[in-house]
């Protein structure tokens, strides 16, 4: 099936398939409950349900899971399931993979996915996966992704997962400072990087990294646009207008809610289509 980009109204670069066909769920129950309480929304969609939801809205969705089995002891939705469903729904789903970087065979698995599947990028969640992105032990992973010409998306900033729990449910926020990803951007200048979310409490750091490193993008997922820090809106309207991306964090924030609030936010008219679609078209090589 040929992708009809003219039909697409927006590209959501940040959505989650939460459960697998046979019940896989990579998050601890208390983490999921805390995140849903924090966001006031939620749900546990399968990959098929993500596809149906976005098809109704004439949107494309980058979809992934978070593999953190060495931390949680729980299997996430299988990458193969996401890839299979995306292949059956190419008009709506763009599959990213998640590989727990702490797995002994992580780089081999990344290379296998690149070699044998239609994976379009990789998602990392340093808080949940408990790693510093700039730990050189993980550099072979980035090298493989860079060689393949695929993007790497990193969670940055605060995490709704664990919020409000004693000890944050064991989640350490230090892992998600975007300055750790700055090292990765320096050492892998050919690697396209997406800093996911407004990176509170390190918003200025994220802006600086993206401004300084030409291959670094920012996605706007996980927050309602009415709460965006003013400096983020200012740079999205000006120097970073070509590297800011629409993302919702579905199902924790729906694109319906995000887009309604985006319509009221202080973005320039000429910048809105860049954020909603055109920047992602370029990032993902859709044209």
Regions found by a protein language model. Name each.
Residues 14, 82, 95, 113, ...:
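Conserved, mostly hydrophobic/aromatic
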Residues 21-27, 75-76, 109, 164-167, ...:
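Short aromatic-enriched loop/helix-cap "lid" or pocket-rim segments at secondary-structure transitions
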Residues 15-17, 65-66, 97-101, 123-126, ...:
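A cross-domain feature marking catalytic cores of carbohydrate-active enzymes
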Residues 44-50, 77-83, 106-108, 178-181, ...:
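Alpha-helical scaffolding within the catalytic cores
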Residues 1-16, 20-56, 60, 111, ...:
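Mid-to-C-terminal alpha-helical segments outside catalytic/metal-binding sites
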Residues 60, 68-163, 172:
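Active-site gating/metal-coordination segments in enzymes
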Residues 26, 120-121, 134-245:
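Catalytic pocket-lining loop regions of alpha/beta-barrel enzymes
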Residues 17-21, 68-71, 101-105, 158-162, ...:
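Active-site environment of divalent metal-dependent phosphoester hydrolases
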């Amino acid at each position: 099936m040929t992708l009809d980009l003219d039909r697409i109204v927006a590209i959501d670069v940040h959505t989650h398939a939460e459960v697998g066909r046979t019940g896989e769920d990579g998050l601890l129950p208390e983490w999921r409950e805390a995140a849903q309480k924090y966001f006031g929304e939620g749900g546990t969609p399968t990959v098929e349900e993500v596809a149906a939801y976005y098809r109704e809205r004439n949107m494309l969705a980058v979809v992934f899971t978070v593999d953190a089995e060495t931390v949680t002891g729980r299997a996430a939705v299988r990458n193969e399931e996401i890839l299979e469903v995306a292949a059956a729904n190419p008009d709506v789903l763009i599959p990213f993979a998640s590989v727990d970087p702490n797995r002994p065979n992580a780089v081999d698995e990344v290379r296998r996915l690149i070699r044998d599947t239609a994976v379009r990028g990789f998602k990392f969640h340093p808080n949940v996966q408990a790693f510093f992105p700039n730990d050189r032990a993980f550099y072979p992973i980035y090298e493989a992704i860079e060689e393949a010409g695929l993007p790497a998306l990193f969670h940055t900033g605060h995490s709704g997962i664990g919020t409000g729990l004693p000890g944050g449910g064991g989640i350490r926020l230090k892992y998600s400072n975007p300055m750790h990803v700055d090292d990765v951007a320096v050492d892998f200048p050919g690697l396209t990087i997406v800093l996911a979310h407004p990176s509170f409490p390190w918003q200025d750091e994220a802006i600086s990294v993206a401004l300084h490193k030409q291959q670094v993008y920012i996605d706007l997922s996980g927050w309602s646009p009415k709460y965006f820090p003013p400096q983020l809106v200012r740079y999205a309207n000006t120097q970073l207008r070509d590297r800011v991306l629409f993302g919702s964090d579905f199902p924790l924030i729906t694109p319906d809610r995000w887009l309604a609030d985006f319509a009221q936010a202080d973005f320039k008219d000429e910048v809105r289509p860049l954020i909603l679609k055109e920047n992602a078209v370029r990032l993902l090589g859709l044209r």
